[in-house]
Amino acid sequence: MNFLRMSELSLTDKVVLIREDLNVPIKAGKVASDARLQASLPTIKMALEKGAAVIVCSHLGRPTEGNPEAIYSLAPVADYLSDKLSAPVTLNSDYFTQGVAIEAGEVVLLENVRFNEGEKKNDAALAQKYADLCDVFVMDAFGTAHRAQASTEGVTQAMHKAGKTACAGPLLAAELDALSLALETPAQPMLAIVGGSKVSTKLEVLHSLAELCSQIIVGGGIANTFLAAQGHSVGASLYEADLLDTAREIMGKTEILLPEYVVVADKSDIDFADFTGSLQQASATIKSVDTIGENDMILDIAPDSAIKLAEAITKAKTILWNGPVGVFEVDAFGQGTQIVAEAVKNSQGFSIAGGGDTLAAIDKYQVADGVSYMSTGGGAFLEFVEGKVLPAVAALEINA
């Protein structure tokens, strides 16, 4: 990919605006999960080491534009960054009216960009205001690269029109390099693991991967649809009857690996208003896919079947993982995902994992050190796999 990289630039005494993805859960005024913040730190530190004055911006949650609600404030993130950088990080809420007073070696965090009217609509005037704050713009938020918004794509266009520099940060560049390696020039055989509740949400991903992969392991509700397409009864399990022909079409393109044995619970034991909570008390039973009863809900891949699937994983040279293969939040229905996770860890192939549930599973089963690359993106990860253009990245390429 042809774009400027922050690592290649001289930033001495430059005011640098870095768009990060700092959209993290906040509970009781504190950061509840810091994975995205940890991922942003190397970029901020690199800019400081290069002698820059660093302005950081991000969104948090989904506030109503023009209505700055305290629950969506980035104040807890500023506190977190201050602690991790061992230096004060000032939160600036009036950056357009008062400007940003900053010197080299300092860090200022702009208040939630989604408080600004026109952010989501990629308002050109708003994008220009961001560009006016800096000498160099750094797009480092892969998780929002699929959105053409004022602080992601519009600001790059504004920088270009003003004759200023816009570039990719180290995190964004690493994401794109890893995904390109996995999707454009993958070592074969390539295998994908695709989980989730519905085929419809991963339909384009499955079609794209079917062209690349020798084998695809499907799990969760997606697997139920493929099992039904093979003529198996799936009982009371979640599946999509209107996509059976689509599932068969995908099976005609590549080898879809399905379990022979699954873990089920009786539908009557499940409170759908408290799904995972009620599953804690439900009985888990292993059954052949040929003996699923009308009240059975398939909730995991049985261990023996998961071990067979793991054998395929260990033989792959490239592995792409998106989605758990069972309700791993409940231990009785998590063994399949655990076995798959450990197989990815122990594989000698290049592995890339993405999606919030996937990263949560990696964290739960402590296999991160065996995964070659973990993508911070959710929707952006899927859209890249689908072959779609990411607007914020395209703007960087055009203006390189």
UniProtKB/Swiss-Prot annotation:
Substrate binds at residues 21-23, 36, 59-62, 114, 147. GO terms for cellular component: cytosol. It catalyses: (2R)-3-phosphoglycerate + ATP = (2R)-3-phospho-glyceroyl phosphate + ADP. GO terms for molecular function: ADP binding; ATP binding; phosphoglycerate kinase activity. Its EC number is 2.7.2.3. Keywords: ATP-binding, Cytoplasm, Glycolysis, Kinase, Nucleotide-binding, Transferase. It is found in: Cytoplasm. Pathway: Carbohydrate degradation; glycolysis; pyruvate from D-glyceraldehyde 3-phosphate: step 2/5. ATP binds at residues 202, 329, 355-358. GO terms for biological process: gluconeogenesis; glycolytic process. PROSITE patterns: PGLYCERATE_KINASE. Pfam families: PGK. Belongs to the phosphoglycerate kinase family. HAMAP family: Phosphoglyc_kinase. Monomer. This is Phosphoglycerate kinase. The lineage of its organism: Bacteria, Pseudomonadati, Pseudomonadota, Gammaproteobacteria, Moraxellales. The gene is pgk.
